[in-house]
Amino acid sequence: MIWPWLISSSLLAAASLSAATVTGSVALVDSQQASVRAKDFSGVVVWLEPANGALTIPRTATRAQMLQKKKRFVPHILAVLAGTTVEFPNHDPIFHNAFSNFDGKVFDIGLYAPGTSRSVRLDRPGVVRVFCNIHPTMSALIAVLPTPYFAVSRGDGQFQIPHVPPGDYVLRVVHERATAAVLQALSTRLTVQESTTTVPSISISESGYLPVLHKNKYGKEYPKTVDESFYPGAKK
């Protein structure tokens, strides 16, 4: 008897022998962000889905990290394969409480101390917006994807997706300051050849975007000021 996972692994290994690298660049336009006006085009998630919808991916446990450091989530934008467990280590001298009540995954990992970590498994594709229940300025985005063929753009807008088997795909993008209509219009079919395939430059408009207003995990407004002396572990 030949086990199905052996067949799948063999096919993946064979595909990797002729796999290509997909490269390209993004540019952000119509932006009110100072960083974008300074030509910082980082944080755009680009991925490929097989045009025929058929995709076999290995059922291996994968993990990723989103740090909490200097009252920020690092990285601010994270892309992972569906089924990935994301760790949220607390590298600050104060407590944090990461949570999400948007789209891809609703979770609340609770209040936890400096130097500790908690995790959540993101098991279905979607966009997960992450916040802290204590610090209203902390936010991040996790793109949970149905495919292992993805990349996040660098500051210069360049991206590179390695190990893509030749074939027909649909290229999709997610950017935290673009509307759903803009992102949908950017979806395009792409034929990947062996070796390197270069995607035409992708221009993403931020016009029409409205900042996501969020409340705390209880659905209430954050206090106007937060005195961190109330939280164990805070520096006095």
Would you name each region that the model predicts?
Residues I2-S16:
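Bacterial N-terminal signal peptides
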Residues A19-K236:
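Extracytoplasmic copper-binding redox domains, predominantly the cupredoxin/blue-copper superfamily
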